[in-house]
Amino acid sequence: MAELKNDRYLRALLKQPVDMTPVWMMRQAGRYLPEYKATRAQAGDFMSLCKNHELACEVTLQPLRRYELDAAILFSDILTVPDAMGLGLYFEAGEGPRFERPTDTIDAIKKLSIPDPEDELGYVMKAVSTIRRELNGQVPLIGFSGSPWTLATYMVEGGSSKTFEKIKKMAYAEPAALHMLLDKLADSVTLYLNAQVANGAQSLMIFDSWGGALSHTAYREFSLRYMQKIVDGLTRFADGRQVPVTLFTKGGGLWLEAMAETGCDALGLDWTVDIADARRRVGHKVALQGNMDPSMLYAPIPRIEEEVGQILAGYGEGTGHVFNLGHGIHQHVDPEHAGAFIKAVHAQSKQYHK
């Protein structure tokens, strides 16, 4: 493997000194870029793009050609794992992801098998190894998965949900069934992420998109407990260096201390959290990633630069901060505004790393 030319992102996650704050964006390879839209049209549809390792590599690299980002993230989807479990994933126009066979009974859960990441998810591993090769040491490659709770919400509901009625009913009326599902998912995700590391991923991120829908106690029981199980089972050293792990619960600002106790290296913050407060609470234990509101990228460029300055000042001096948005970049953002955001982070952050 080529030697890493820019390891700023990995160093910040491990709270090692850096010359400036590293930056990348969730969904940086995506619908806001015209070149992405062209590649997706070439693939035919979203899942065909995910399953073609050469095209998945192409869209992963597209934002790096435009911007001086400090990391690449594998182009894939969090629902690859449930799809590999045989649920029949498809995408409906305007409706988002749907499953032909929802996992909403204990009998359906019992029948689920844990997918072999090199077999049923081999297309993801081929994408990881291709991207790692093509990056040629330019920046590190982030691998990722959805959290067990988040994957379970789609599997039980049969797709996206605003109320989470079916899975919450299962959580409170049939908790043993949900725990069985979450346990299988935790095992599947651990294997999946470790296979990504074996194929070249240099950092890992777990997206708990829907953990914030849970009550205070239910979050610990149904979400955090299973992310903890994954963290305990991950490969944390490869290619002669540590493989940092970031946990991100959208709407998880209440639980930062508990998340930091899992042994992860970093926590992702959404835009509702004050980064200065988050650093006071957990910054001695973990690095922090975030957390500008993605909608700020619609603002005039001087306002974007001002917001970047405020967040950098909120975190303050020293390492342990990876700048990011508080969630994925919106599809209608002007790519020039994204570029101005990235430049502002690098330019304004040097003063905090003397």
Swiss-Prot record:
It is an enzyme of class 4 (lyase). One of its GO terms (cellular component) is cytosol. Pathway: Porphyrin-containing compound metabolism; protoporphyrin-IX biosynthesis; coproporphyrinogen-III from 5-aminolevulinate: step 4/4. The keyword Lyase applies. It comes from the Bacteria. It catalyses: uroporphyrinogen III + 4 H(+) = coproporphyrinogen III + 4 CO2. The record marks D77 as: Transition state stabilizer. InterPro entries: UROD/MetE-like_sf (IPR038071), Uroporphyrinogen_deCO2ase_HemE (IPR006361), Uroporphyrinogen_deCOase (IPR000257). GO terms for biological process: heme biosynthetic process; protoporphyrinogen IX biosynthetic process from glutamate. Its EC number is 4.1.1.37. Keywords: Cytoplasm, Decarboxylase, Lyase, Porphyrin biosynthesis. PROSITE patterns: UROD_1, UROD_2. SUPFAM superfamilies: UROD/MetE-like. Substrate binds at R27, Q28, A29, G30, R31, F46, D77, Y154, S209, H327. The keyword Lyase applies. CDD domains: URO-D (cd00717). One of its GO terms (molecular function) is uroporphyrinogen decarboxylase activity. It is found in: Cytoplasm. Its main location: cytoplasm. NCBIfam families: hemE. Catalyzes the decarboxylation of four acetate groups of uroporphyrinogen-III to yield coproporphyrinogen-III. Homodimer. HAMAP family: URO_D. Belongs to the uroporphyrinogen decarboxylase family. This is Uroporphyrinogen decarboxylase. It comes from Shewanella oneidensis (strain ATCC 700550 / JCM 31522 / CIP 106686 / LMG 19005 / NCIMB 14063 / MR-1). The lineage of its organism: Bacteria, Pseudomonadati, Pseudomonadota, Gammaproteobacteria, Alteromonadales. The gene is hemE.
